[in-house]
Amino acid sequence: VDAFADDLLLLVQGNRRNELEQSASEALSVVYRYGTNIGVEVSDSKTVCMMLKGSLNMLNRVVHVSTNGMDDKRIRCVDRVRYLGVNVGIGMDFSVHIDGMKRRLTTAIMRLRGVLRKSWGLKRGVVSMVVKGLFLPAVMYGASVWYEQLHKRKLRGSRRLSEELVSCQRVVLYACTRVCRTVSTEAMQILFGSLPWDIECFRRANCTKSKGPAMNESDLVTDEDLYELSLHECRELVDQRALAAWQDRWEATSNGRVTYEWIRDVGFSGRSMKYFGAEPEGLLRLTGHGSMNSFLFSRNLSNSPACACGTEREDWIHVLCECDMYAAFRDLDSIGVRRTEVGWDVSGVLLDRASMSVCVPLSSCAFRMRELIVQRMRENEES
């Protein structure tokens, strides 16, 4: 028996269906009699049965509960139940919890779209506070209970629950970072400074488990790592391991490689949004996704990948570092861009506040000038 406030959970076991039904009936009859004695009515609509393990099919069956001469109660068997805010399916399946979470997040984001626009709306600090103070706690509620199932799949061949959880994060990040829809989730996480939600789930669960329960193989730390450490030191170690796991994932993925050129260390994630804010041209050069001809041509949205200057390929690095049309705005040494044997290195730009203070206005002028050039070329073609 597990009770919290007015919610009650009864666990019964048996090897056969009739054993389960008899045990459940006996336990529930005690609950109904106790409620009658103290004047509390048990809600028939909220009282359900569900199989937590085994292969017996109890779905759509009814458990009859005797209540001492009163009308017998009929308890229906269901395939999912919500207990203390966490949705659980048959066989301790938490995929129903993540599916429901994604629907609720999508609904909440739709209601916030009025203040989360691409060119205006809430400031970056307010948006970050909404995500960290509203969305993240709601998503991570009960994480220490269901995080161990993130490696499982709902169906054979389907995505893992960890991937489903990250897809929930994408819904929030796309609304908050104001980037193109084609930008990868990995790049959005770096730009916004948001730990991948599956890793965040493990981090929070491990911080909770550091108080006593033993760790397992899937955790970020082991019992030996936490031996003789204080609670504060345990949580610091968990945070370090979470960042290390994020760093390994960021280096291994093939997505968001333009963003990787700017921000290679996840410890600096979120810094770009602090400097660039919601400027479309700033996010364009950090992601490579936008109005560049090479990007548009790769998606059959432009007739040619060439630049107006005659170069065969117009991308973010060409506009920022090479194109002669923007030479008047260019000062690569002062913004920390270096020429290497393999190309241009922009990884040091965001590391220094002085270089950023020069980079932002110079590159913004170059990209705005490009938009004017493109607009005039279109007007000439139409005329």
UniProtKB/Swiss-Prot annotation:
Domain of life of the source: Eukaryota
Upper classification of the organism: Eukaryota, Metazoa, Ecdysozoa, Arthropoda, Hexapoda
Catalytic activity: DNA(n) + a 2'-deoxyribonucleoside 5'-triphosphate = DNA(n+1) + diphosphate
GO molecular function: endonuclease activity; RNA-directed DNA polymerase activity
PROSITE patterns named among the record's database cross-references: RT_POL
Entry keyword Nuclease: yes
Keyword vocabulary terms for this entry: Endonuclease, Hydrolase, Nuclease, Nucleotidyltransferase, RNA-directed DNA polymerase, Transferase, Transposable element
Protein name: Retrovirus-related Pol polyprotein from type-1 retrotransposable element R1 3
Residue segments, region Nucleic acid-binding endonuclease: 229-383
First-tier enzyme category under EC: transferase
EC annotation from Swiss-Prot or TrEMBL: 2.7.7.49
Domain Reverse transcriptase: residue ranges: 1-88
